[in-house]
Structure formats: C-alpha cells, structure tokens
Amino acid sequence: MNKANSFNKEELIACGHGKLFGPNSPRLPVDNMLMIDRIITINDNGGEFGKGEIVAELDIKPELWFFDCHFITDPVMPGCLGLDAMWQLVGFYLGWEGAEGKGRALGVGEVKFTGQVLPGAKKVTYKLNIKRTIHRKLVMGIADAILEVDGRQIYSATDLKVGVFSDTSTF
C-alpha cells in the first residue's frame, strides 16, 4: 500500500485504474470526471478534528470541458463538480487508509456556494478535515470541506459521507 503524503496527477490516474492502493481499493474517476490534479498533503492526524486532512488542487484552464457547455456565453464550473471532488477525496482517503471495496457518496449535511469558478481563474484548492472514519462491517468516512478559488473560499460542505462497499449490486 502507498502511504505517501502527497500524490501527483499520474498517481491519481493510477488510483482510478486500481494501480495505486491495489485492485480492490476505492477508485477515483478518470478523464473528465477526475476533478483533482494533485494532492498536496494527506495525513491521518492533522486537520481541525485531529483525525486527518487533505489539501488538493485543480488547475483551471479556459479549455476545461465544462466551460464549453455550462453555460453558452456564461461559462462557469458547475458547483456539483466541486462537491463531487470533495466526495472523491473522502473516498481516496479511505483507500489511502487501506479500505477495500467500491466507494460511493452517501450524503452531505449542508452545502453553501458563495462564489463561482470562472475560466479566468488559475487554481481551485480543496481543503478537507476528516471528522471520523469507521472500519468495521461498515466502512465510511465523514469530513467537512471548503473549496477556494485563487485563495478565496467560495464553497463549504459539512458532513460529507462516503462509504466503501464490497458489493454494490443491491445498492
């Protein structure tokens, strides 16, 4: 298992193919749905709650796929993609801790959008504070997160929940 404290884009893509933490670990999406270019730091003892934190980034370029279709003449990154990135990172954290199975977003307490990501922005930063992880019959991570664009906080989410399941056929 790779217990590194940072990951580059190639390693994140390897996670999407089951080649970073192992073939049975939770996977990140690949291609357009991977909303992360790098993980700057990941640990299991930092953050607001002392149970772990993740800081990750996405480089913003005007040619990103969503700017062409959301919306014509008014391009903006869909808020749901930033929220999905937060769930992606909670699932990644569980895989980094050694969980095996398929990751699924289970919910979120509250989401607030107070700004937007436009094509002229340079960088999105995701900051997650792990609140709790459960590694029993139920495997689940819970985190609070914020999204910053060029250093300004514009999204927040509380109680992001991701579960890891050995069988999702009846989910």
UniProtKB/Swiss-Prot annotation:
This is 3-hydroxydecanoyl-[acyl-carrier-protein] dehydratase. The keyword Transmembrane helix does not apply. Transmembrane segments: none annotated. GO terms for biological process: unsaturated fatty acid biosynthetic process. Its main location: cytoplasm. It comes from Shewanella oneidensis (strain ATCC 700550 / JCM 31522 / CIP 106686 / LMG 19005 / NCIMB 14063 / MR-1). Its EC number is 4.2.1.59, 5.3.3.14. It is found in: Cytoplasm. One of its GO terms (cellular component) is cytoplasm. Belongs to the thioester dehydratase family. FabA subfamily. Homodimer. Pathway: Lipid metabolism; fatty acid biosynthesis. Necessary for the introduction of cis unsaturation into fatty acids. Catalyzes the dehydration of (3R)-3-hydroxydecanoyl-ACP to E-(2)-decenoyl-ACP and then its isomerization to Z-(3)-decenoyl-ACP. Can catalyze the dehydratase reaction for beta-hydroxyacyl-ACPs with saturated chain lengths up to 16:0, being most active on intermediate chain length. The keyword Cell membrane does not apply. It catalyses: a (3R)-hydroxyacyl-[ACP] = a (2E)-enoyl-[ACP] + H2O; (3R)-hydroxydecanoyl-[ACP] = (2E)-decenoyl-[ACP] + H2O; (2E)-decenoyl-[ACP] = (3Z)-decenoyl-[ACP]. The active site is at H70. GO terms for molecular function: (3R)-hydroxyacyl-[acyl-carrier-protein] dehydratase activity; trans-2-decenoyl-acyl-carrier-protein isomerase activity. HAMAP family: FabA. Keywords: Cytoplasm, Fatty acid biosynthesis, Fatty acid metabolism, Isomerase, Lipid biosynthesis, Lipid metabolism, Lyase. InterPro entries: FabA, FabA_FabZ, HotDog_dom_sf. It holds the Pfam family FabA.
